[in-house]
Amino acid sequence: MASQEEFYRTQIFGTVFEITNRYADLNPVGMGAFGLVCSAVDTYTQQPVAIKKIMKPFSTAVLAKRTYRELKLLKHLRHENLICLEDIFLSPLEDIYFVTELQGTDLHRLLQTRPLEKQFLQYFLYQILRGLKYVHSAGVIHRDLKPSNILINENCDLKICDFGLARIQDPQMTGYVSTRYYRAPEIMLTWQKYNVEVDIWSAGCIFAEMIEGKPLFPGKDHVHQFSIITDLLGSPPKDVIDTICSENTLKFVTSLPHRDPVPFTERFKNLKPDAVDLLEKMLVFDPKKRITAGDALTHPYLAPYHDPTDEPVADAKFDWNFNDADLPVDTWRVMMYSEILDFHQVPDSQINPNDTFDDQVAAATAAAEAARQQQQQKQQQQKQQQQRHQGVEHGAQHVQLQHGAKQLSADPLVGDSNGGIPLNVSAANETLNNFANQAAQYATDFE
């Protein structure tokens, strides 16, 4: 039976949350640089969910692309140890909302409240590495792995979240983004050349933090961060120094006094030998010598949980063709709408998700241009109509214009009548219009 949903508005920390009546009992759980996260109850399933509001996703091309990337990744990456996208919708205010499973807490909060017993430490590390094995097999680097991005429920099930900064496995990167405490040394030394090994380093830092209850490398700045890493690992080996491209970085590193490594058995005296061995293999200066997620899962330390028949890899590599695209906001908007329709299994007459990325861009660009022309024609018609009424209703005209400038369309995929680019870039798409006409909400079928 089809269920028609309606939007309602509420304020959370001064931020308007505009969601459908499918979701109730909103409570804030976290705030990030790009959005606010609230817990809620899915009234269809009676299950708790997390709703992440992406604020002003189309305010800039950079933010639009970032939102598009996160949605594409969430749709592609489906694994027990990764957060799962359950719903996505666009509000009349043009904000995008991701709905995912709700986990009880995150590892950062958990470590602040209590030390971890050995069995929990092992199980959490196992699940982190199990998730990373899958992510890396899909050709994806998380790039921002840290305790606050690791969610845990009351059953100790662990899920990695926040793929908004994830990138392709590419030897030429465009910058570094990971939180400093968990940042691999190659990012600081050769930030244009890194790969999936940066996630293994971050996981090693998290492993050590679970052991000690505090960050292993709490650097105050980049220089201090590198310094405290060398306090434990010693000076970087020649093979690593030879990869440094920046002349200033090379001068800095070679000017430092030589430091010998501290044996991990001495630094972590209360840790069992197999745990020390795995940690040491994860925190290696040279990324080429760092253990992989797959190999780490077979390490004796994780033997109680290792199951080679239940540690899957991705069915296909993630398609990163869009990653170097420099597109205008309107085109990203169309691409995003197409992805939302595809998630809801609603056909889009203008963009075929099975087409190549270039073909999708061409279709999206044409749709955006058609929308602009449609809006220009509408504005011209309104202008002509207003001119015809001039001299007839002088007093009423001012009121009419004021009302028209403030009136919002009832269609969430159509812009306002005050000259903005219309959001309905698929005006000829009957299915999309049917969705839009239901009080600014997609109609979702439930049996």
Curated annotation (Swiss-Prot):
Residues 373-389 have a biased composition (Low complexity). The modification Phosphothreonine is found at residue 174. One of its GO terms (cellular component) is cytoplasm. The keyword Transcription regulation applies. ATP binds at residues 29-37, 52. Gene3D superfamilies: Phosphorylase Kinase, domain 1 (3.30.200.20), Transferase(Phosphotransferase) domain 1 (1.10.510.10). Its EC number is 2.7.11.24. Keywords: Activator, ATP-binding, Cytoplasm, Kinase, Nucleotide-binding, Nucleus, Phosphoprotein, Serine/threonine-protein kinase, Transcription, Transcription regulation, Transferase. It catalyses: L-seryl-[protein] + ATP = O-phospho-L-seryl-[protein] + ADP + H(+); L-threonyl-[protein] + ATP = O-phospho-L-threonyl-[protein] + ADP + H(+). The modification Phosphotyrosine is found at residue 176. The active site is at residue 144. One of its GO terms (molecular function) is protein serine/threonine kinase activity. Belongs to the protein kinase superfamily. Ser/Thr protein kinase family. MAP kinase subfamily. HOG1 sub-subfamily. PANTHER family: MITOGEN-ACTIVATED PROTEIN KINASE. This is Mitogen-activated protein kinase HOG1. It comes from Eremothecium gossypii (strain ATCC 10895 / CBS 109.51 / FGSC 9923 / NRRL Y-1056) (Yeast). The lineage of its organism: Eukaryota, Fungi, Dikarya, Ascomycota, Saccharomycotina. The gene is HOG1.
